[in-house]
Every structure is written in structure tokens, then in C-alpha cells.
Amino acid sequence: MDILLKQIDSNYPHGKAKEATQQVLANLRKEVVEGTRQTAFDQAEILSLVQKQLEEKEFSLRRVINGTGTVIHTNLGRSLLSAKTQEQLLATSFHYSNLELDLENGKRGSRYSHLVSIVKKLTGAEDVLVVNNNAAAVLLVLSSLTKETEVLVSRGELVEIGGAFRIPDVITSSGGTIAEVGTTNKTHLTDYEKALTEETGAILKVHTSNYRIVGFTETPALTDLAELAHANNLPLINDLGSGLLLDMRPFGLPYEPTVKEVLDQGCDVVTFSGDKLLGGPQAGIIVGKREYIEKMKKNQLLRALRIDKMTLSALEATLALYLDEKEALQSVPTLQMIGLSEEDCLGKAAELAAMLQPLAELSVKIEKDTSKIGGGSYPEHLLPTYAVVLSSERFTADILQEKLRFSATPIITRIKNDCNYLDLRTISLEEFPTILESLQEIFK
């Protein structure tokens, strides 16, 4: 071990070099024990592997290739940002910017003012606030508008969105009290009417985008709920979750309400995510009536939850693409991947398979498969796709998956039928050479 460490590049800290050497030796021993190692190794190869691992692990957060077919993959960073968003990030993040400076009068401005005009055009909302995620958005809204009051929520909408983030707990954390309305499968307008008291502070709608209650169900129309809320001087708050700006039905997807639609139907405040169906950075976007947004701006929580210049820049650039629907569909990677046809996926699969076919000891096939949208969106809907299917007598499916994951650029696959599936919906053409190089290294 000491002899090896002395020959490693001195630019790396001793601790990191030692850890990398131990990992390489452990991997080599494992290959020998499992019988997957067919050639002997010497000191030169060990040093090469250690050097490679040190270079790869310079940073913990790394780029990966998503071969799972899940477009909005939470574990892999959710939505990819567009090329135009990247340009805007470079322009504003590596230089000074007018983040909180009004260029017209030279005085201090608001970071949120950069989004007001574009949000008005896209949704019709009077004002906008942005915090670091939708959970924070819901917390800020309730803390600002319903503290020490009751919040009416249908029992069928008392959801958990993941990570133990539950609507009842959020209401309690924000200082309010939950008032459950109706039943799990049926809630009528009269249920809300009967639940109204002098303590009621708001009516909350939670869009169940990550699950479905089907069959014998009923829920009042938003327009009726808005009329009831406004007749009692209450705000109607809508947690829309994923947050669509475009109607996705032309792509064969089921109907989901857009932000503009729910605002037009009378909702006073709407919250949604930036990094799901919108295809932007992680953010919690709050849009709605100015009188309610102004109350949120005075909440001390806002300072703790506010977004930075990079998130703001990326979000503005993403929203700008939606001013032209055609451009959004072509330029926002999330929408582009969702919109890929079955034929497009087959064409990509054929191209990748042709590149991999010459590799010895690797079986390469093309199979019809299904992709998921992910991110808690369209839970029941699968997208038809094609996958390149890899198998080998030399490695089990689990071992091959591990080796792909340990590549210089980690490749994340899905195991099915004892094979590794690479779904072409979530793999770009530019990533094909990297996949080939990784497999050449594995099967050399």
C-alpha cells in the first residue's frame, strides 16, 4: 500500500489517495473471488485505476446518464435545463447582475420583480413569489394566510407527497388547524358549507397529481368552491403540485389542469413546482392575487426560503420559452422527452444497438418497453418506448449494472428479466459514445 501511495500524483490529498487505493484493491479482489477477472493485474494497472478513480471522484455530485426511462427522476435531479437556460445562467451567475437593483431609478429593487411580467403573460396572475420548493411554497402561503385559523380540506386530498411531507402536518406547522371535509372518495359543496365557522381562514384544494381515486367519486367544481370562498371573504388556495403551463393532451396524455385554468376558475393563490412538468430548476412558485402575495412578502419565513440568483435566472429563462408554445415543446428537455414518439425511440435504439453490437461477450437486443414521466406526475400513464437490452454470460445483470454505475460517467440502468435495459427516451444522441466507451472498458 505505501509503495503505491508514493507513486500517486502528489496533487491529491493523502487521505483521498489512500481511500481510492483501498477501493481499487477491494474491487480487484472482488473480481477475482467472483471469477469475473480473466487477466492478471500488475502495479501499473492498479496505479492507472487509482488515478482514474481520483479524477472521477473529485466531486461527489456528478453527471450521470439516465437509462431508466423515467423522465423526471427525483434521484437523478429531476428536470434537465434547456440550452437557452444554460446561456442565461452563464451570463448572470458568473458576473454581477441587477438581482435587487432597479436599473430605471438606480434604487434597491425586488428579486421577484424579474418574474412578474412574464408570469402575468403566461398565467394571468397579478403577482408572483418564488421560494426553494413547492413544500416551502405551501408552508409560506398557509403561514401567511391561515395562522391561528381553520383550513378546510377534503379528506380525499390529505396527501403525502414524499419524504413524509404531509398536508395535515404542514397546516399544523404553519400555525393553523385542519378541518377535514367530506369523505375520502366523495366531497360535496355542501360539506364545505357545513364546515364553515367564524374560525375558518381559507379553503385549500390539493391536486392529487401523484395518485388517483377512481370509481364512485365526486368533488365540487373549482368555480363553485371559489364562489363559496369569496362569498365568505375567504381565499381559495390551490396546491397544484407538478404545475402545467401547457395542455399535454395533444401528446396523448390525460387531462391535467394548467395554472392559468385554475386561476381563471377563481383560485386566489396557486402553488406549483419548478422542476417537474414545468421543466425548470427546483423552485416553489406562488402566483395569484396581489393582496395575498403582499402578505407573504411580509412573512419572516420568506427570507429563510427565498431563492438565489441562479435559480431565479434559470426559472426566468425557462418561463421565457413558454411565450412561444412551439419553442417550449422543442427546447424544454422535459417536454421534448415526453413528446418523443415511439418511432423516435426506435430509431435511437437502432443507432445505439448498432454501435454496441461489435462488442464481444455482450448480447445486444432491442425491445419494446414503457417509460414513466415521474416526479409524481401522471402516475397511471406509461409512454411507449424502445430499449436497448444488454446481457452477458460473463457478468450477472446486477454485476453489469454495478460496473456501468461505476463508469467514468455513471450509467444508470433498469434491470428486467435478468437484463439491463437502456431506455432511449431519456438518453441523448450525444451520450452514445460515452456508453460505448464505458462498455468497451468493461469488456476489454
Predicted ranges, named:
Residues 26, 67-68, 78-104:
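Glycine-rich phosphate-binding segment of PLP-dependent enzymes
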Residues 342, 346-428:
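Conserved C-terminal alpha-helix-loop-beta "cap" of PLP-dependent enzymes
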Residues 291, 299-300, 307-356, 369-370, ...:
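Structural motif of enzymes handling amino- and sulfur-group chemistry
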Residues 1-57:
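Long amphipathic alpha-helical segments
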Residues 106-322, 357, 438:
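Conserved PLP-enzyme active-site core in the AAT-like
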Residues 60-61, 272, 409-414:
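A short linear hydrophobic-aromatic micro-motif
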Residues 1, 65-69, 278-281, 383, ...:
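Short Gly/Ser/Thr- and Asp/Glu-enriched loop/turn motifs at secondary-structure junctions
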Residues 57, 63-80:
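N-terminal Rossmann-like NAD(P)+-binding subdomain of aldehyde/semialdehyde dehydrogenases
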